[in-house]
Swiss-Prot record:
Record's subunit section: Part of the 50S ribosomal subunit.
Domain of life: Eukaryota
Annotated InterPro entries: Ribosomal_uL3, Ribosomal_uL3_bac/org-type, Ribosomal_uL3_CS, Transl_B-barrel_sf
Annotated organism of origin: Nicotiana tabacum
GO BP of this protein: translation
Sequence intervals crossing the membrane: none
Protein name stated in the entry: Large ribosomal subunit protein uL3c
Gene: RPL3
Protein role: One of the primary rRNA binding proteins, it binds directly near the 3'-end of the 23S rRNA, where it nucleates assembly of the 50S subunit.
Length: 259
């Protein structure tokens, strides 16, 4: 009996499902250099508490709107991660002292392992080098920053609840007179038979606010060591009492590699 070689044009293969012809190759995790550099911080930062806004008069007489930021007990290095143990270099910082019962047992065990007081918030700062940092080290804002420096500030915006399209997306309202019954309604959300559906991402009423936002390249106007506060030019996310994350501003090519 003669056997013909099996090829992709064989009629037998056309009756097989497509998934039977696929060959599964082992996939390897590939992390590009651009994603690594994008996650790097320009330097270690601190956490702080938003206190409110006010006007600040510069020496030239210019009035500048500033946000007053205060510091509670904390900003202590709780853990140092290295490429050998964790695959990347990072400094973990704790902020805001609380009572023991406010933390879970795993959180308490993590801090007690290093002999650190109970801290409510833990955040990491991924760095190129972790030289000069040690556990239980106290981070002083005045030693890390100076007046005139640019910083990136992250925080959670004020939650507005469920809002309509006018407030949430700045839509225009409809006619208020001339027989109109749709004053603040959304209006048309798509076509008819084609495409026969509503496109994903359509701006519609929904929950507004309560999301994480980062404001970049804000100027430090004033540092007051006696009152333990700083003043940052502009508005910061959240309401008074909100947690803020302050880090050196990322400037690609200067303190962040291009690739």
């Amino acid at each position: 009996l003669k056997t013909t070689p099996l090829t992709l044009r064989s009629p037998f293969l056309h009756r097989l499902p497509l998934r039977a012809l696929k060959t599964h190759k082992p996939t390897s995790l590939h992390i590009s250099k651009s994603s690594i550099s994008a996650s790097l911080e320009a330097g270690v930062g601190v956490m702080a508490t938003k206190l409110g806004m006010m006007s600040f008069f510069e020496e030239s007489g210019t009035v500048v709107p500033v946000t007053v930021v205060g510091f509670r007990e904390g900003n202590i290095v709780t853990q140092i991660k290295t490429e050998a143990t964790d695959g990347y270099n990072a400094v973990q910082v704790g902020y805001r002292r609380v009572r023991d019962r406010k933390l879970t047992k795993p959180e308490m065990g993590h801090l007690e392992k290093s002999g650190i007081i109970p801290l409510r918030h833990l955040q990491e700062f991924r760095l190129q080098s972790i030289d000069g940092f040690e556990v239980t080290q106290k981070l002083d804002f005045g030693e890390l920053f100076k007046e005139g420096d640019l910083v990136d500030v992250s925080g959670t915006t004020i939650g507005k609840g469920f809002q309509g399209g006018i407030k949430r997306h700045n839509f225009k309202r409809g006619q208020m007179t001339h027989g109109s019954k749709s004053h603040r309604q959304l209006g048309s959300i798509g076509a008819g038979t084609t495409p026969g559906r509503v496109y994903k991402g359509k701006k519609m009423p929904g929950r507004m606010g309560g999301t994480k936002r980062k404001i970049r390249k804000l100027k430090i106007v004033k540092i007051d060591d006696q009152l333990n506060i700083i003043m940052i030019k502009g508005a910061l996310p959240g309401k008074p009492g909100n947690l803020l994350r302050i880090a050196p501003a990322k400037i690609v090519g200067k303190n962040i590699p291009k690739s």
